[in-house]
A protein has these predicted regions:
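Trp- and S/T/G-rich repeat-edge/linker motifs of beta-rich repeat architectures
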Residues: 2-33, 40, 44, 52-119, ...
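Short, well-ordered, aromatic-rich surface patches in folded extracellular/luminal domains
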Residues: 454
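Calcium-coordinating acidic loop motifs
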Residues: 126-127
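Conserved beta-propeller blade signature
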Residues: 44-48, 133-137, 183-187, 240-244, ...
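C-terminal substrate/ligand-recognition segments
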Residues: 364
Length: 486
């Protein structure tokens, strides 16, 4: 049921109290850390997880922690890291696990999960008369065969639709998939070196027959610019496919009508992170809304790129108009080659929240644009600050980590009716400080679903604690706002 319009002719958006918790504790297993992808398909909600994010981070990334928030064995693969797909039925408020990644023999000759997680999920139906298909993009361990695109027509059986690595590429993960003009587009996102965000193959791929694994490249490597380390996000908007990159000098945004013969002609719309530079490192989210394409930025690693010594810095929000011009909505005012840009919302980067690392996902529902963030203050009390910038530690060292956790931590969810005026729905992870990020949002006939990133399970080390104890608030969560908005 839709809510009535107000005197301004606007249907009210959802508030915090409209959201009901429908899954918690990682579906009963705190190892399910991220509700990493989500889709509405054939009358059900599908949610796919990534497991054991903190143990995997410790094993592969140079992140300085005095103590890790959760138990991290020396070999993370001694844990159950087999990613899962869950299905929700609204009518009886029930969940069913419909898929679990199989164990295979890795390149080291030992059993290993085929998938650590599922970073993308999309419904593809090229023609109204065609049977809709659910595609899921996977994250493969480095000693696995490579990422796959899984395909299902019934929501229960998920079969590989391509060869490992999409077309045999030496990569570990595929993040984004976009149906556009009757075709499916995707791109690799991770390398064998352990970084899930930097690809050795920054190319857009297209398929007119993804069910049979027929893929071809339709762009030059990095659009001809070596600084584009990865094509990170894509979206269709009006007549163009838009692509956002990962670039240490600042992300770029390119677009193409994807017509004629590939490789298609591509036009650069935004350069050098909209002239903010490296603090706008990558495009995390893209979403079309009321005649514009909205662009959410960020810095890999949750806003602090320790590998490249970038950040910490909160993200900006932009929007691109059909003529290729752009507005700064949330961010730092500055002079640019296309004139002075001031944030039209009045908000500084991160909605005035220094600990905001990403503008992670966006979704339109019932006339409102909803935006979820990633917020990293929950790890502040565990981090080794020896290599942090002096200016930064001079501020942080005056803060109590417990006070920050109690009063600051948790993702934010904002909504806007016009892209310029933003209203907070929650700024504390829906009352759970361990909900670091809002990773998934899906609009459906039943309402708006949101899924969280919460790697603080199944056991965690309390701040100033001496041992790991069960965390009833650890593991990903899913919420539904249904019926009339408050």
């Amino acid at each position: 049921m839709k809510s009535p319009m107000n005197r301004l002719g606007i249907r009210p958006g959802f508030n915090k109290d409209d959201f009901k918790l429908i899954a918690q504790g990682g579906f009963g297993d705190g190892m399910n850390a991220y509700a990493h992808s989500m889709a509405w398909f054939n009358g059900h909600l599908y949610v796919a997880t990534t497991r054991g994010n903190f143990p995997l981070m410790k094993a592969r990334l140079p992140i300085g922690m005095d103590v890790w928030p959760v138990e991290c064995p020396e070999n993370p693969f001694s844990l159950d890291l087999q990613a899962e797909i869950w299905r929700y039925t609204v009518a009886d408020d029930s969940w069913e696990r419909v898929s679990k990644a199989p164990l295979i023999i890795g390149s080291h000759g030992k059993p290993i999960t085929r998938e650590l997680g599922y970073r993308g999920m999309v419904v593809y139906q090229p023609k109204p008369s065609d049977t809709p298909m659910l595609f899921v993009s996977t994250w493969s361990p480095a000693k696995g065969p490579g990422p796959l695109l899984l395909r299902s027509v019934d929501g229960r059986n998920f079969e590989p639709s391509c060869e490992p690595g999409l077309v045999g590429l030496p990569v570990t993960t595929i993040r984004t998939m976009v149906p556009f003009k009757g075709r499916l587009f995707t791109t690799p996102a991770g390398s064998r070196g352990g970084n899930t965000n930097v690809s050795a193959h920054s190319v857009v791929y297209e398929s007119r027959d993804p069910a049979n694994g027929q893929w071809e490249p339709v762009s030059d490597f990095g659009f001809g610019e070596a600084g584009n380390k990865t094509i990170f996000e894509m979206a269709g908007f009006e007549d163009h496919l838009y692509v956002g990159t990962f670039n240490l000098e600042g992300f770029q945004v390119w677009r193409s009508t994807v017509e004629s013969k590939p490789p298609y002609q591509w036009e650069k719309i935004i350069d050098r992170g909209a002239y903010r530079g490296g603090l706008n490192q990558c495009v995390l989210s893209m979403y079309p809304f009321k005649g514009a394409l909205y662009i959410g930025g960020g810095i890999q690693g949750g806003g602090v790129d320790t590998q490249n010594r970038v950040g910490p810095a909160p993200p900006e929000l932009l929007r691109i108009l059909p003529d290729g011009s752009w507005d700064l909505l949330v961010g730092e005012g500055r002079d640019t080659p296309v004139g002075r840009k001031e944030p039209l919302s009045g908000y500084l980067p991160g909605f005035d929240n220094f600990f905001c690392g990403y503008f992670w996902r966006m979704c339109a529902h019932d006339g409102w644009l909803y935006m979820g963030t990633f917020e990293w203050s929950s790890v502040l009390g565990y981090a080794n600050r020896a290599r942090w910038p002096e200016v930064f530690t001079g501020i942080i060292n005056h803060l109590s980590p417990q006070s920050v956790l109690d009063n600051q931590s948790g993702f934010s969810l904002y909504r806007s009716h016009d892209g310029e005026n933003w209203v907070p729905v929650t700024t504390n992870g829906m009352d759970n400080p361990y909900n670091m990020g809002l990773r998934t949002l899906v609009s459906s006939p039943q309402g708006l679903f949101i899924g969280t990133a919460n790697p603080f399970g199944p056991k965690y080390m309390p701040l100033n604690g001496t041992r790991y104890i069960p965390n009833p608030r650890g593991g990903c969560e899913v919420f539904l706002a249904q019926g009339n908005a408050a």
